[in-house]
């Protein structure tokens, strides 16, 4: 009997271990309670009936190929049924290949014009909760549109072209490895997409992308049918931290705007990717690093970004656009709707705020002509 009991226990142990591992895995995917340090930084339900210009601004801008931008005229507050309650929501309209109405985008073109609203505030680590509906129950997946939620921040830093291959003692934020759009033109870029639907007209696996300066990782995750013409809650938790970097000396960095910036090519770029450092002591530094961006829809874990996660803050963008890579848009109008928006900031030690501070600039006017700066 003792031998039988021992054998039974030995047989059961792997099963118990497997169940324990499954339980731990399930627990890691659970959307937990907010950290005690979390601060509610944005709570928008549109109940005032107006888009508050101290909180938000609408873009008149074109980027990418095969479209004519986004315009403020395609952004408005309307009434809609959210769950069982009729309330005000943000409506971002898209004009397809058959649109012939009065609203125009770049070059006064009518087709393939969307609408995007952007927060005035820049955010870093924290929880982002956005209630969004794509299309309608009758047409939940309008081909050709890219409905999206994303954070974005940027900063251009310039030096004369003849100095472009080296660091600059007068411009410590300039980095020769971040040159873009010409010699001496460095660009800091922070972006998280959570998510971006519609590539190739598909809505099953939206993109969850990360952009860290010159680095980028595109991922897709199963949205489990959330593009169904109904409201769903999209939640993303962004975390940052400090990653110790060995061998960096005080003589190899310059202090600017509260952070330390590498000024020596002997420090391998791959160790910090253009991110600033924090000083821990004499000849001791840590990189301000993005750690993870984890994603849920209606409380169900969707996936996680762990590569090229930014640490620099960005503004929250909500809306819809129609790039070439979304495919044909064989209809007149479609729309994406946003109900309540909430953002809690965590203030993680790797956060970099106060560096990317500019609003996104318009690049064409109401007349459709490019703006010259």
How would you label these PLM feature ranges?
Residues 21-373:
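GH16 jelly-roll
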